[in-house]
Protein backbone atom coordinates (compact mmCIF):
# COMPACT_ATOMS: atom_id res chain seq x y z
CA UNK A 1 0.00 0.00 0.00
CA UNK A 2 0.94 3.66 -0.20
CA UNK A 3 -0.19 6.99 1.20
CA UNK A 4 0.63 10.04 -0.90
CA UNK A 5 -0.19 13.69 -0.27
CA UNK A 6 -2.10 14.61 -3.40
CA UNK A 7 -1.25 18.28 -3.90
CA UNK A 8 2.53 18.15 -3.68
CA UNK A 9 3.21 14.42 -4.08
CA UNK A 10 5.34 13.32 -1.09
CA UNK A 11 4.89 9.71 0.03
CA UNK A 12 3.89 9.54 3.70
CA UNK A 13 3.75 5.75 4.01
CA UNK A 14 4.53 2.78 1.80
CA UNK A 15 4.73 -0.99 2.01
CA UNK A 16 5.21 -3.24 -1.04
CA UNK A 17 4.42 -0.15 -3.11
CA UNK A 18 6.14 -1.53 -6.21
CA UNK A 19 4.69 -5.04 -6.17
CA UNK A 20 2.80 -5.73 -9.40
CA UNK A 21 -0.81 -6.83 -9.02
CA UNK A 22 -4.00 -6.86 -11.06
CA UNK A 23 -5.86 -3.54 -10.65
CA UNK A 24 -9.39 -4.70 -11.55
CA UNK A 25 -11.74 -1.68 -11.63
CA UNK A 26 -8.99 0.66 -10.44
CA UNK A 27 -8.08 0.53 -14.14
CA UNK A 28 -10.89 3.02 -14.69
CA UNK A 29 -8.85 5.80 -13.08
CA UNK A 30 -6.77 5.93 -16.26
CA UNK A 31 -9.90 5.62 -18.40
CA UNK A 32 -11.28 8.69 -16.62
CA UNK A 33 -8.01 10.59 -17.11
CA UNK A 34 -8.27 10.05 -20.87
CA UNK A 35 -11.93 11.08 -20.88
CA UNK A 36 -11.13 14.31 -19.06
CA UNK A 37 -8.09 14.86 -21.30
CA UNK A 38 -10.46 14.80 -24.29
CA UNK A 39 -12.85 17.19 -22.55
CA UNK A 40 -9.96 19.50 -21.71
CA UNK A 41 -8.76 19.53 -25.34
CA UNK A 42 -12.26 20.27 -26.58
CA UNK A 43 -12.53 17.12 -28.70
CA UNK A 44 -15.28 15.92 -26.35
CA UNK A 45 -18.15 17.75 -24.66
CA UNK A 46 -20.27 16.76 -21.68
CA UNK A 47 -23.47 16.92 -23.73
CA UNK A 48 -22.10 14.90 -26.66
CA UNK A 49 -24.05 11.71 -27.27
CA UNK A 50 -22.52 8.24 -27.25
CA UNK A 51 -24.07 5.17 -28.88
CA UNK A 52 -23.58 1.83 -27.12
CA UNK A 53 -22.03 -0.90 -29.28
CA UNK A 54 -22.64 -4.64 -29.07
CA UNK A 55 -19.14 -5.00 -27.59
CA UNK A 56 -19.83 -2.45 -24.86
CA UNK A 57 -23.17 -4.09 -24.04
CA UNK A 58 -21.48 -7.49 -23.71
CA UNK A 59 -19.36 -6.48 -20.72
CA UNK A 60 -20.00 -8.45 -17.55
CA UNK A 61 -19.13 -7.61 -13.96
CA UNK A 62 -20.06 -4.15 -12.70
CA UNK A 63 -22.40 -2.65 -15.28
CA UNK A 64 -25.28 -0.26 -15.77
CA UNK A 65 -26.99 -2.52 -18.33
CA UNK A 66 -26.64 -0.38 -21.43
CA UNK A 67 -28.39 -1.85 -24.47
CA UNK A 68 -26.89 -2.04 -27.95
CA UNK A 69 -27.84 1.15 -29.78
CA UNK A 70 -28.72 2.98 -26.56
CA UNK A 71 -27.68 6.63 -26.58
CA UNK A 72 -26.42 8.45 -23.49
CA UNK A 73 -24.56 11.71 -22.95
CA UNK A 74 -20.89 11.82 -22.04
CA UNK A 75 -21.75 13.22 -18.62
CA UNK A 76 -24.19 10.41 -17.89
CA UNK A 77 -21.59 7.81 -18.84
CA UNK A 78 -18.99 9.51 -16.64
CA UNK A 79 -21.43 9.17 -13.74
CA UNK A 80 -21.95 5.51 -14.64
CA UNK A 81 -18.19 4.95 -14.48
CA UNK A 82 -17.43 7.00 -11.37
CA UNK A 83 -20.47 6.12 -9.26
CA UNK A 84 -21.33 2.58 -10.35
CA UNK A 85 -18.01 1.44 -11.90
CA UNK A 86 -19.82 0.52 -15.11
CA UNK A 87 -17.70 -1.65 -17.38
CA UNK A 88 -20.14 -1.18 -20.24
CA UNK A 89 -20.03 2.60 -19.84
CA UNK A 90 -16.21 2.53 -19.81
CA UNK A 91 -16.04 0.60 -23.08
CA UNK A 92 -18.69 2.81 -24.69
CA UNK A 93 -16.62 5.89 -23.86
CA UNK A 94 -13.37 4.26 -25.01
CA UNK A 95 -14.90 3.39 -28.38
CA UNK A 96 -16.41 6.85 -28.75
CA UNK A 97 -13.11 8.62 -28.12
CA UNK A 98 -10.73 6.36 -30.05
CA UNK A 99 -12.89 4.25 -32.36
CA UNK A 100 -12.04 1.01 -30.59
CA UNK A 101 -11.22 -0.17 -27.09
CA UNK A 102 -7.88 -1.51 -28.36
CA UNK A 103 -6.81 1.92 -29.62
CA UNK A 104 -7.99 3.56 -26.41
CA UNK A 105 -5.91 1.10 -24.36
CA UNK A 106 -2.87 2.02 -26.45
CA UNK A 107 -3.39 5.63 -25.38
CA UNK A 108 -3.84 4.51 -21.77
CA UNK A 109 -0.42 2.88 -21.83
CA UNK A 110 1.13 5.94 -23.48
CA UNK A 111 -0.39 8.17 -20.80
CA UNK A 112 0.88 5.88 -18.05
CA UNK A 113 4.38 5.99 -19.52
CA UNK A 114 4.19 9.78 -19.67
CA UNK A 115 3.33 9.90 -15.97
CA UNK A 116 6.32 7.74 -15.09
CA UNK A 117 4.21 4.72 -14.14
CA UNK A 118 7.06 2.24 -14.59
CA UNK A 119 5.25 -0.88 -13.40
CA UNK A 120 1.90 -0.55 -15.17
CA UNK A 121 0.50 -2.09 -18.32
CA UNK A 122 -3.14 -2.09 -19.40
CA UNK A 123 -4.91 -4.68 -21.55
CA UNK A 124 -8.43 -3.26 -21.33
CA UNK A 125 -10.17 -0.07 -20.21
CA UNK A 126 -12.29 -1.45 -17.37
CA UNK A 127 -10.25 -4.10 -15.55
CA UNK A 128 -12.28 -7.19 -16.43
CA UNK A 129 -9.38 -8.96 -18.11
CA UNK A 130 -7.57 -11.77 -16.32
CA UNK A 131 -4.48 -11.31 -18.51
CA UNK A 132 -1.19 -11.42 -16.58
CA UNK A 133 -0.11 -8.51 -18.78
CA UNK A 134 -2.67 -6.23 -17.07
CA UNK A 135 -0.98 -4.98 -13.93
CA UNK A 136 -0.04 -1.99 -11.81
CA UNK A 137 1.34 -1.17 -8.37
CA UNK A 138 0.22 0.84 -5.37
CA UNK A 139 2.77 3.53 -6.27
CA UNK A 140 1.52 3.83 -9.84
CA UNK A 141 -2.10 3.94 -8.65
CA UNK A 142 -1.15 6.86 -6.40
CA UNK A 143 0.53 8.61 -9.34
CA UNK A 144 -2.48 8.32 -11.64
CA UNK A 145 -4.95 9.11 -8.86
CA UNK A 146 -3.02 12.28 -8.08
CA UNK A 147 -3.04 13.21 -11.78
CA UNK A 148 -6.81 12.79 -11.98
CA UNK A 149 -7.83 14.72 -8.87
CA UNK A 150 -5.29 17.55 -9.16
CA UNK A 151 -5.63 18.14 -12.91
CA UNK A 152 -9.37 17.49 -13.05
CA UNK A 153 -10.89 18.32 -9.63
CA UNK A 154 -14.36 18.22 -11.21
CA UNK A 155 -14.13 14.44 -10.74
CA UNK A 156 -14.83 15.05 -7.05
CA UNK A 157 -18.31 16.34 -7.92
CA UNK A 158 -19.14 12.92 -9.33
CA UNK A 159 -17.26 10.69 -6.90
CA UNK A 160 -19.06 12.24 -3.91
CA UNK A 161 -22.52 11.33 -5.27
CA UNK A 162 -24.02 8.50 -3.22
CA UNK A 163 -27.03 7.67 -5.41
CA UNK A 164 -28.45 9.01 -8.66
CA UNK A 165 -30.88 7.79 -11.31
CA UNK A 166 -30.22 7.60 -15.03
CA UNK A 167 -32.81 6.96 -17.73
CA UNK A 168 -32.47 4.08 -20.16
CA UNK A 169 -34.16 4.89 -23.49
CA UNK A 170 -34.21 1.82 -25.75
CA UNK A 171 -36.45 0.12 -28.28
CA UNK A 172 -38.07 -1.66 -25.34
CA UNK A 173 -39.11 1.66 -23.83
CA UNK A 174 -37.94 4.05 -21.12
CA UNK A 175 -36.98 3.05 -17.60
CA UNK A 176 -35.12 4.52 -14.66
CA UNK A 177 -31.97 2.88 -13.34
CA UNK A 178 -30.41 3.69 -9.99
CA UNK A 179 -26.66 4.22 -9.66
CA UNK A 180 -25.22 3.53 -6.21
CA UNK A 181 -21.66 4.50 -5.32
CA UNK A 182 -19.32 1.52 -5.00
CA UNK A 183 -17.31 3.49 -2.41
CA UNK A 184 -19.21 2.94 0.83
CA UNK A 185 -16.81 5.21 2.75
CA UNK A 186 -18.44 8.38 1.43
CA UNK A 187 -21.33 7.73 3.85
CA UNK A 188 -19.04 7.59 6.88
CA UNK A 189 -18.90 10.52 9.35
CA UNK A 190 -15.42 11.51 8.17
CA UNK A 191 -15.11 13.04 4.71
CA UNK A 192 -13.84 10.80 1.96
CA UNK A 193 -14.40 12.57 -1.32
CA UNK A 194 -12.83 10.42 -3.98
CA UNK A 195 -11.60 6.97 -4.79
CA UNK A 196 -11.92 4.17 -7.25
CA UNK A 197 -12.39 0.82 -5.61
CA UNK A 198 -11.63 -2.41 -7.38
CA UNK A 199 -12.06 -6.03 -6.51
CA UNK A 200 -11.81 -9.34 -8.29
CA UNK A 201 -10.88 -12.70 -6.82
CA UNK A 202 -7.21 -12.33 -7.76
CA UNK A 203 -6.82 -8.68 -6.76
CA UNK A 204 -5.14 -7.41 -3.59
CA UNK A 205 -5.07 -3.72 -4.41
CA UNK A 206 -7.26 -0.93 -3.13
CA UNK A 207 -6.98 2.58 -4.46
CA UNK A 208 -6.05 5.09 -1.79
CA UNK A 209 -8.81 7.32 -0.52
CA UNK A 210 -8.61 11.10 -0.90
CA UNK A 211 -9.86 12.60 2.33
CA UNK A 212 -10.40 16.18 3.32
Which residues does each PLM region occupy?
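Penicillin-recognizing serine hydrolase domain
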Residues: 100-206, 211
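Active-site-adjacent loops and short helices of periplasmic peptidoglycan-processing enzymes
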Residues: 1-139, 145, 149-150
